[in-house]
Curated annotation (Swiss-Prot):
GO molecular function: G protein activity; GTP binding
Protein name in UniProt: Ras-like protein family member 11B
Assigned protein family: Belongs to the small GTPase superfamily. Ras family.
Enzyme class, broadest EC rank: hydrolase
Region (Disordered), start-end ranges: 205-228
SUPFAM superfamilies: P-loop containing nucleoside triphosphate hydrolases
Pfam families: Ras (PF00071)
UniProt entry tagged with the keyword Isomerase: no
Domain of life from the UniProt record: Eukaryota
Catalytic activity: GTP + H2O = GDP + phosphate + H(+)
Organism name: Xenopus tropicalis
Listed GO biological process terms: mesendoderm development
Length: 247
């Protein structure tokens, strides 16, 4: 996977809307779009995972997200792809009825693939995986939507509540690929998780109907706008500076 254009914030969307970036230069070739939803419990590191993948940077403190949709141009096996990554608000552990979570449902229906994230330091977030997996499958009854399970915070061994083999066993049982990562310390593992999904979706789209292949094309983004992400970085850095000053 090769980056061919900088990450672009598409939108912080109102409920029910997904808008796209416009193209960075008129007349450029179209790119096939790949849509990935990142879901999981609160505080497991979904936003950090997305930002790490898109920018290779890690900042530990983020404001609670309202559901940001990001785009990045990449090249896989010589094909230009526009990856759209939907960062979703955390699912509450006590949310017994996922059907009523409108924002989650819209994100899952929109997606071509799903990343389910849990934290090895939070066994309750691990308990959500099966429910989220089943829910995603129910929303795509006629399509074998690719799903990757990511165990985050692998560096926090002293706080570990979930053993790696438990995550791997569950992923195997559900028929999913499994990655244990430390978003804060290892970019490569994060990259690999998304690369696997991109290749699998691209393969599915290549074997789809002509109409499906036609619908998967969108214009390349133009006028990249990173203001939203830069604002988050500045807020996080400012908070750290204030904390250090007050000590």
């Amino acid at each position: 996977m090769r980056l061919i254009q900088n990450m672009c914030t598409i939108t912080e969307y109102p409920p029910g809307t997904h808008t796209e970036c416009a193209s960075s230069s008129a007349g450029t070739a179209s790119s096939r779009v790949i849509k990935i939803a990142v879901v999981g419990g609160s505080g497991v590191g979904k936003t950090a995972l997305v930002v790490r993948f898109l920018t290779k940077r890690f900042i530990g403190d983020y404001e609670r997200n309202a559901g940001n949709l990001y785009s990045r141009q990449v090249q896989i096996d010589g094909m230009n792809l526009a990856i759209q990554v939907q960062d979703t608000p955390g699912v509450q552990i006590n949310d017994q009825n996922l059907d009523s979570n409108e924002q989650l449902n819209k994100s899952l229906r929109w997606a071509d693939a799903v990343v389910i994230v849990f934290s090895i330091t939070d066994c309750k977030s691990f308990d959500l995986i099966s429910r989220l997996h089943q829910h995603a499958r129910q929303l795509h009854p006629d399509n074998r939507i690719p799903i990757v399970i990511v165990a985050n915070k692998a560096d926090l061994l002293h706080l570990k509540q979930v053993e790696p083999q438990h995550g791997l066993q569950l992923a195997n049982m559900l028929g999913c690929t499994f990655y244990e990562v430390s978003v804060s310390e290892n970019y490569i593992d994060v990259y690999n998780a998304f690369q696997v999904l991109c290749k699998e979706i691209s393969k599915q789209q290549n074997t789809g109907t002509p109409e499906r292949r036609k619908n998967s094309l969108i214009p390349r983004p133009k006028s990249p706008n990173m203001q939203d992400l830069k604002r988050r970085f500045k807020q996080a850095l400012s908070a750290k500076v204030r904390t250090a000053t007050s000590v």
